[in-house]
Amino acid sequence: MTGRDALSDGRARSRALVPGGPSTGSRPRGFAITDLLGLEAELPAPEGPGPGSGCEGPAAAPRAGPGLGGSCPARGALPLGLGLLCGFGAQPPAAARAPCLLLADVPFLPPEGPEPLAPRFPGRPPPSAARQKRSESVSTSDEDSPSEDRSDRKASPAPSKRKKRRHRTVFTAHQLEELEKAFSEAHYPDVYAREMLAMKTELPEDRIQVWFQNRRAKWRKREKRWGGSSVMAEYGLYGAMVRHCIPLPDSVLGSGEGGLLGSCAPWLLGMHKKSAGTIRKAESEEKLAGLWGSDHLKEGSSPHQAGPQRGLEEGSPVSGVEDVVIDLSSSTRQETDRAQQGVGAQGRPDSEGLEGLQPGKEGAL
Protein backbone atom coordinates (compact mmCIF):
# COMPACT_ATOMS: atom_id res chain seq x y z
CA MET A 1 0.00 0.00 0.00
CA THR A 2 1.37 3.36 -0.98
CA GLY A 3 1.24 6.55 1.03
CA ARG A 4 -1.48 7.98 -1.20
CA ASP A 5 -3.76 5.04 -0.52
CA ALA A 6 -3.16 5.39 3.19
CA LEU A 7 -4.10 9.04 3.05
CA SER A 8 -7.31 8.28 1.17
CA ASP A 9 -8.27 5.63 3.75
CA GLY A 10 -7.61 8.02 6.58
CA ARG A 11 -9.73 10.67 4.89
CA ALA A 12 -12.62 8.25 4.57
CA ARG A 13 -12.40 7.30 8.28
CA SER A 14 -12.28 10.93 9.37
CA ARG A 15 -15.38 11.73 7.32
CA ALA A 16 -17.20 8.87 8.89
CA LEU A 17 -16.32 10.06 12.40
CA VAL A 18 -17.39 13.70 11.81
CA PRO A 19 -21.11 14.11 12.75
CA GLY A 20 -23.29 16.04 10.30
CA GLY A 21 -20.66 15.95 7.59
CA PRO A 22 -21.48 15.17 4.01
CA SER A 23 -21.34 11.63 2.76
CA THR A 24 -18.17 10.48 1.07
CA GLY A 25 -19.90 9.35 -2.06
CA SER A 26 -22.01 12.46 -2.55
CA ARG A 27 -19.16 15.01 -2.33
CA PRO A 28 -17.44 15.53 -5.69
CA ARG A 29 -13.67 15.70 -5.93
CA GLY A 30 -12.40 19.21 -6.66
CA PHE A 31 -9.46 20.40 -8.68
CA ALA A 32 -7.59 22.06 -5.81
CA ILE A 33 -4.06 21.00 -4.95
CA THR A 34 -5.25 19.53 -1.64
CA ASP A 35 -7.82 17.38 -3.43
CA LEU A 36 -5.32 16.20 -6.00
CA LEU A 37 -2.63 15.44 -3.38
CA GLY A 38 -5.03 13.92 -0.84
CA LEU A 39 -4.24 16.39 1.94
CA GLU A 40 -7.89 16.95 2.82
CA ALA A 41 -8.01 13.79 4.97
CA GLU A 42 -5.86 15.33 7.67
CA LEU A 43 -8.00 18.50 7.92
CA PRO A 44 -10.95 18.36 10.32
CA ALA A 45 -14.20 19.68 8.94
CA PRO A 46 -15.24 22.98 10.52
CA GLU A 47 -18.56 23.37 12.20
CA GLY A 48 -21.27 24.63 9.94
CA PRO A 49 -23.11 27.80 10.79
CA GLY A 50 -26.57 27.83 12.19
CA PRO A 51 -29.62 28.21 10.03
CA GLY A 52 -30.18 31.83 11.06
CA SER A 53 -26.64 32.96 11.42
CA GLY A 54 -26.24 34.38 7.88
CA CYS A 55 -23.03 36.33 7.27
CA GLU A 56 -22.54 37.97 10.66
CA GLY A 57 -18.98 39.06 11.26
CA PRO A 58 -18.63 38.06 14.95
CA ALA A 59 -19.95 34.57 14.29
CA ALA A 60 -17.87 34.00 11.18
CA ALA A 61 -14.58 35.34 12.49
CA PRO A 62 -13.89 32.68 15.15
CA ARG A 63 -14.99 29.99 12.69
CA ALA A 64 -12.59 31.00 9.99
CA GLY A 65 -9.57 31.11 12.32
CA PRO A 66 -9.16 27.42 13.04
CA GLY A 67 -10.16 26.45 9.54
CA LEU A 68 -7.45 28.46 7.86
CA GLY A 69 -4.74 28.80 10.47
CA GLY A 70 -4.42 26.19 13.19
CA SER A 71 -6.04 22.98 11.94
CA CYS A 72 -3.61 22.31 9.05
CA PRO A 73 -0.67 20.31 10.44
CA ALA A 74 1.56 20.92 7.44
CA ARG A 75 0.99 24.70 7.56
CA GLY A 76 4.32 25.45 9.23
CA ALA A 77 6.24 23.15 6.92
CA LEU A 78 4.58 24.34 3.68
CA PRO A 79 5.45 27.64 2.03
CA LEU A 80 3.19 30.65 2.19
CA GLY A 81 1.22 29.90 -0.97
CA LEU A 82 0.64 26.23 -0.17
CA GLY A 83 -0.52 27.13 3.34
CA LEU A 84 -3.15 29.44 1.87
CA LEU A 85 -4.32 26.73 -0.52
CA CYS A 86 -4.38 24.25 2.33
CA GLY A 87 -6.64 26.55 4.34
CA PHE A 88 -9.02 27.06 1.42
CA GLY A 89 -9.14 23.35 0.65
CA ALA A 90 -10.14 22.50 4.21
CA GLN A 91 -13.35 24.51 3.93
CA PRO A 92 -16.62 22.63 3.20
CA PRO A 93 -18.46 23.11 -0.08
CA ALA A 94 -20.47 26.23 -0.77
CA ALA A 95 -23.81 24.58 0.04
CA ALA A 96 -22.76 23.84 3.64
CA ARG A 97 -21.02 27.18 4.23
CA ALA A 98 -22.40 30.64 4.61
CA PRO A 99 -23.77 32.22 1.41
CA CYS A 100 -21.18 35.00 1.45
CA LEU A 101 -17.40 34.96 1.90
CA LEU A 102 -15.77 37.73 3.90
CA LEU A 103 -12.45 38.80 2.42
CA ALA A 104 -11.41 40.06 5.86
CA ASP A 105 -11.10 36.42 7.00
CA VAL A 106 -8.11 35.86 4.72
CA PRO A 107 -5.02 36.71 6.80
CA PHE A 108 -2.82 37.48 3.83
CA LEU A 109 -4.98 40.34 2.47
CA PRO A 110 -5.61 43.66 4.19
CA PRO A 111 -9.25 44.20 5.20
CA GLU A 112 -9.43 47.53 3.38
CA GLY A 113 -8.19 46.35 -0.02
CA PRO A 114 -10.93 44.61 -2.02
CA GLU A 115 -8.66 44.10 -5.05
CA PRO A 116 -6.08 41.26 -4.96
CA LEU A 117 -2.43 42.14 -5.15
CA ALA A 118 -0.94 41.76 -8.60
CA PRO A 119 2.76 41.08 -9.27
CA ARG A 120 4.52 44.24 -10.31
CA PHE A 121 7.28 44.20 -12.87
CA PRO A 122 9.88 46.98 -12.96
CA GLY A 123 9.33 47.80 -16.62
CA ARG A 124 5.52 47.53 -16.74
CA PRO A 125 3.09 49.94 -15.08
CA PRO A 126 0.39 48.58 -12.80
CA PRO A 127 -2.93 47.65 -14.43
CA SER A 128 -4.79 50.44 -12.65
CA ALA A 129 -2.39 53.03 -14.07
CA ALA A 130 -2.72 51.46 -17.53
CA ARG A 131 -6.51 51.60 -17.30
CA GLN A 132 -6.33 55.22 -16.18
CA LYS A 133 -4.05 56.15 -19.07
CA ARG A 134 -6.29 54.31 -21.52
CA SER A 135 -9.36 56.12 -20.22
CA GLU A 136 -7.50 59.44 -20.44
CA SER A 137 -6.46 58.71 -24.04
CA VAL A 138 -10.02 57.77 -24.94
CA SER A 139 -11.35 60.93 -23.33
CA THR A 140 -8.74 63.09 -25.06
CA SER A 141 -9.48 61.44 -28.41
CA ASP A 142 -13.18 62.00 -27.81
CA GLU A 143 -12.47 65.61 -26.94
CA ASP A 144 -10.26 66.08 -30.00
CA SER A 145 -12.66 64.49 -32.46
CA PRO A 146 -15.40 67.13 -32.10
CA SER A 147 -12.85 69.86 -32.71
CA GLU A 148 -11.65 68.07 -35.85
CA ASP A 149 -15.23 67.63 -36.97
CA ARG A 150 -15.87 71.30 -36.35
CA SER A 151 -12.75 72.24 -38.31
CA ASP A 152 -13.84 69.96 -41.16
CA ARG A 153 -17.27 71.54 -41.13
CA LYS A 154 -15.70 74.96 -41.24
CA ALA A 155 -13.40 73.99 -44.11
CA SER A 156 -16.01 72.12 -46.15
CA PRO A 157 -18.46 74.99 -46.78
CA ALA A 158 -15.68 77.18 -48.20
CA PRO A 159 -15.39 75.40 -51.62
CA SER A 160 -19.13 74.97 -51.85
CA LYS A 161 -19.62 78.72 -51.75
CA ARG A 162 -20.52 80.12 -55.13
CA LYS A 163 -18.21 82.72 -56.52
CA LYS A 164 -19.50 86.21 -56.74
CA ARG A 165 -20.81 87.00 -60.16
CA ARG A 166 -18.87 89.67 -61.94
CA HIS A 167 -20.74 92.81 -62.76
CA ARG A 168 -21.76 93.19 -66.39
CA THR A 169 -19.83 95.77 -68.34
CA VAL A 170 -21.96 98.52 -69.84
CA PHE A 171 -20.54 99.70 -73.17
CA THR A 172 -21.10 103.17 -74.53
CA ALA A 173 -22.10 103.91 -78.11
CA HIS A 174 -18.54 105.00 -78.99
CA GLN A 175 -17.06 101.82 -77.56
CA LEU A 176 -19.55 99.62 -79.39
CA GLU A 177 -18.83 101.42 -82.64
CA GLU A 178 -15.08 100.88 -82.29
CA LEU A 179 -15.57 97.24 -81.34
CA GLU A 180 -17.90 96.54 -84.26
CA LYS A 181 -15.48 98.21 -86.64
CA ALA A 182 -12.63 96.05 -85.36
CA PHE A 183 -14.83 92.95 -85.58
CA SER A 184 -15.65 93.64 -89.22
CA GLU A 185 -11.92 93.83 -89.95
CA ALA A 186 -10.89 90.72 -88.03
CA HIS A 187 -12.89 88.23 -86.01
CA TYR A 188 -9.79 87.02 -84.16
CA PRO A 189 -7.67 90.05 -83.27
CA ASP A 190 -4.26 89.42 -81.75
CA VAL A 191 -2.98 90.83 -78.48
CA TYR A 192 -1.49 93.92 -80.11
CA ALA A 193 -4.77 94.78 -81.84
CA ARG A 194 -6.69 94.27 -78.60
CA GLU A 195 -4.30 96.54 -76.71
CA MET A 196 -4.68 99.27 -79.32
CA LEU A 197 -8.44 98.88 -79.13
CA ALA A 198 -8.26 99.09 -75.34
CA MET A 199 -6.44 102.41 -75.61
CA LYS A 200 -9.12 103.73 -77.97
CA THR A 201 -12.11 102.57 -75.98
CA GLU A 202 -10.56 102.92 -72.48
CA LEU A 203 -11.55 99.35 -71.65
CA PRO A 204 -9.41 96.59 -70.13
CA GLU A 205 -7.93 94.12 -72.56
CA ASP A 206 -9.59 91.09 -70.96
CA ARG A 207 -13.02 92.70 -71.31
CA ILE A 208 -12.35 93.25 -75.01
CA GLN A 209 -11.32 89.61 -75.40
CA VAL A 210 -14.55 88.45 -73.75
CA TRP A 211 -16.58 90.79 -75.96
CA PHE A 212 -15.00 89.30 -79.09
CA GLN A 213 -15.76 85.77 -77.87
CA ASN A 214 -19.41 86.65 -77.30
CA ARG A 215 -19.59 88.51 -80.60
CA ARG A 216 -18.21 85.54 -82.53
CA ALA A 217 -20.75 83.22 -80.89
CA LYS A 218 -23.57 85.61 -81.76
CA TRP A 219 -22.31 85.92 -85.32
CA ARG A 220 -22.16 82.13 -85.78
CA LYS A 221 -25.73 81.76 -84.52
CA ARG A 222 -27.05 84.54 -86.72
CA GLU A 223 -25.28 83.66 -89.97
CA LYS A 224 -27.08 80.46 -90.87
CA ARG A 225 -27.58 80.95 -94.57
CA TRP A 226 -25.42 79.33 -97.27
CA GLY A 227 -21.98 80.82 -97.75
CA GLY A 228 -22.32 83.20 -94.80
CA SER A 229 -21.67 80.94 -91.81
CA SER A 230 -17.94 81.56 -91.67
CA VAL A 231 -14.96 82.41 -93.80
CA MET A 232 -13.66 78.86 -93.40
CA ALA A 233 -16.86 77.50 -94.97
CA GLU A 234 -16.39 79.80 -97.95
CA TYR A 235 -12.76 78.74 -98.17
CA GLY A 236 -13.75 75.06 -98.17
CA LEU A 237 -16.37 75.67 -100.86
CA TYR A 238 -13.84 77.56 -102.94
CA GLY A 239 -11.34 74.68 -102.64
CA ALA A 240 -14.00 72.20 -103.77
CA MET A 241 -14.86 74.41 -106.74
CA VAL A 242 -11.22 74.63 -107.79
CA ARG A 243 -10.56 70.89 -107.40
CA HIS A 244 -13.71 69.72 -109.17
CA CYS A 245 -14.04 72.64 -111.62
CA ILE A 246 -17.44 73.63 -110.23
CA PRO A 247 -18.71 76.99 -111.48
CA LEU A 248 -19.71 79.65 -109.00
CA PRO A 249 -23.45 79.53 -108.25
CA ASP A 250 -25.61 82.15 -109.91
CA SER A 251 -26.97 83.25 -106.52
CA VAL A 252 -23.50 84.35 -105.43
CA LEU A 253 -22.79 86.04 -108.76
CA GLY A 254 -26.15 87.82 -108.65
CA SER A 255 -25.62 89.01 -105.08
CA GLY A 256 -22.26 90.52 -106.06
CA GLU A 257 -23.65 92.91 -108.67
CA GLY A 258 -24.09 95.64 -106.09
CA GLY A 259 -20.55 95.12 -104.71
CA LEU A 260 -18.68 92.72 -102.48
CA LEU A 261 -20.19 94.09 -99.27
CA GLY A 262 -23.74 93.36 -100.44
CA SER A 263 -22.93 89.78 -101.41
CA CYS A 264 -23.90 86.81 -99.26
CA ALA A 265 -20.39 85.40 -99.69
CA PRO A 266 -18.05 88.35 -100.13
CA TRP A 267 -14.85 86.42 -99.56
CA LEU A 268 -15.85 83.68 -101.99
CA LEU A 269 -16.86 86.20 -104.65
CA GLY A 270 -13.62 88.13 -104.23
CA MET A 271 -11.57 84.95 -104.57
CA HIS A 272 -13.53 84.03 -107.70
CA LYS A 273 -12.73 87.39 -109.30
CA LYS A 274 -9.07 87.05 -108.35
CA SER A 275 -8.87 83.57 -109.84
CA ALA A 276 -10.62 84.74 -113.02
CA GLY A 277 -8.13 87.62 -113.34
CA THR A 278 -5.23 85.22 -112.80
CA ILE A 279 -6.51 82.91 -115.55
CA ARG A 280 -6.91 85.86 -117.92
CA LYS A 281 -3.41 87.06 -117.14
CA ALA A 282 -1.96 83.60 -117.80
CA GLU A 283 -3.67 83.47 -121.20
CA SER A 284 -2.29 86.89 -122.16
CA GLU A 285 1.22 85.82 -121.11
CA GLU A 286 0.93 82.75 -123.33
CA LYS A 287 -0.10 84.95 -126.26
CA LEU A 288 2.85 87.27 -125.66
CA ALA A 289 5.25 84.31 -125.52
CA GLY A 290 3.88 82.99 -128.81
CA LEU A 291 4.19 86.37 -130.51
CA TRP A 292 7.74 86.82 -129.25
CA GLY A 293 8.74 83.40 -130.63
CA SER A 294 7.21 84.12 -134.03
CA ASP A 295 9.11 87.41 -134.20
CA HIS A 296 12.41 85.61 -133.67
CA LEU A 297 11.59 83.10 -136.40
CA LYS A 298 10.86 85.89 -138.89
CA GLU A 299 14.26 87.61 -138.71
CA GLY A 300 14.38 88.21 -142.47
CA SER A 301 10.95 89.77 -142.74
CA SER A 302 10.61 93.45 -143.76
CA PRO A 303 9.50 96.12 -141.33
CA HIS A 304 6.55 96.89 -143.64
CA GLN A 305 4.96 93.57 -142.73
CA ALA A 306 4.93 94.64 -139.15
CA GLY A 307 2.41 97.36 -140.02
CA PRO A 308 -0.40 95.05 -141.23
CA GLN A 309 0.39 92.64 -138.43
CA ARG A 310 0.12 95.45 -135.93
CA GLY A 311 -3.16 96.50 -137.54
CA LEU A 312 -4.55 93.03 -137.12
CA GLU A 313 -3.42 92.96 -133.53
CA GLU A 314 -5.09 96.29 -132.91
CA GLY A 315 -8.29 94.92 -134.42
CA SER A 316 -8.23 91.89 -132.13
CA PRO A 317 -10.02 92.17 -128.74
CA VAL A 318 -6.87 92.34 -126.59
CA SER A 319 -6.38 94.60 -123.62
CA GLY A 320 -4.45 97.86 -123.82
CA VAL A 321 -1.56 96.42 -121.86
CA GLU A 322 -1.02 93.74 -124.51
CA ASP A 323 -1.04 96.40 -127.28
CA VAL A 324 1.62 98.39 -125.50
CA VAL A 325 3.79 95.30 -125.09
CA ILE A 326 3.42 94.39 -128.78
CA ASP A 327 4.28 97.92 -129.89
CA LEU A 328 7.39 97.89 -127.75
CA SER A 329 8.47 94.55 -129.21
CA SER A 330 8.02 95.75 -132.84
CA SER A 331 9.96 98.95 -132.23
CA THR A 332 12.76 96.98 -130.64
CA ARG A 333 12.89 94.66 -133.64
CA GLN A 334 13.10 97.57 -136.04
CA GLU A 335 15.96 99.10 -134.11
CA THR A 336 17.92 95.83 -134.18
CA ASP A 337 17.36 95.50 -137.96
CA ARG A 338 18.62 99.00 -138.54
CA ALA A 339 21.72 98.37 -136.46
CA GLN A 340 22.56 95.24 -138.46
CA GLN A 341 22.08 97.06 -141.78
CA GLY A 342 24.29 99.93 -140.60
CA VAL A 343 27.14 97.53 -139.84
CA GLY A 344 26.89 95.99 -143.36
CA ALA A 345 26.97 99.39 -145.19
CA GLN A 346 30.79 99.75 -144.64
CA GLY A 347 31.37 103.47 -144.34
CA ARG A 348 28.05 104.81 -145.55
CA PRO A 349 25.94 107.01 -143.33
CA ASP A 350 23.18 105.24 -141.54
CA SER A 351 20.42 106.92 -143.50
CA GLU A 352 22.01 106.28 -146.92
CA GLY A 353 22.80 102.69 -146.05
CA LEU A 354 19.26 102.09 -145.01
CA GLU A 355 17.85 103.71 -148.18
CA GLY A 356 20.24 101.82 -150.47
CA LEU A 357 19.75 98.46 -148.89
CA GLN A 358 16.00 98.68 -148.58
CA PRO A 359 15.14 98.16 -152.33
CA GLY A 360 17.66 95.35 -152.65
CA LYS A 361 16.27 93.58 -149.64
CA GLU A 362 12.76 93.88 -150.96
CA GLY A 363 13.82 92.56 -154.36
CA ALA A 364 15.56 89.62 -152.78
CA LEU A 365 12.46 88.74 -150.84
From Swiss-Prot:
Q: What gene name is given for the protein in this entry?
A: VSX1
| Localization (cell) | Nucleus
Q: What is this protein called?
A: Visual system homeobox 1
Recorded hits in Pfam families, A to Z, give: Homeodomain
- Organism equals Bos taurus
Return the annotated region ranges for Disordered.
Answer: 1-65, 114-169, 294-365
Which parts of the sequence form the motif Octapeptide motif? 31-38
* One BP term from GO: regulation of DNA-templated transcription
Q: Which PROSITE patterns match?
A: CVC, HOMEOBOX_1, HOMEOBOX_2
Q: Which family does it belong to?
A: Belongs to the paired homeobox family.
